[in-house]
Amino acid sequence: MFCDCENFTELDVTGFDTGCVEDMSYMFYGCENLMNLDVTGFNTGCVTDMSSMFQRCENLMELNVTGFDTGCVTNMSWMFGECKNLMKVDVTGFNTGCVTDMSRMFYGCKNLIELDGSENIKYKYNIADTEDMFEGCEKLEI
């Protein structure tokens, strides 16, 4: 939807009706200059794919996705990958019970220091792929 919108520095999507959306993959991919993004009003109850949703949002420093209903999501690969200036993500409330792919979910988030709700990201028996999930997260202590 906003894939490769390199010139956006802020984006207000609080009024978007996302109640029937099943695929949010690549939604904000490559929004390299995006610094402010408010997705707190997103209804994600039907979403199954969040892969690369915020990938390469290189100037995003903080993201609050606490309101995301992730109970139906199966793919979270690269979700926050290559967000090199991302310092804080709040995933409190995440339900990863159906997720089968979390590969490179936080790959290359070299400035990530705070991952609130990380206890909700569980490696359950059904997760087939967690390869390089936190690769390059040099400052993160979980």
Regions found by a protein language model. Name each.
Residues M1-I142:
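Negatively charged
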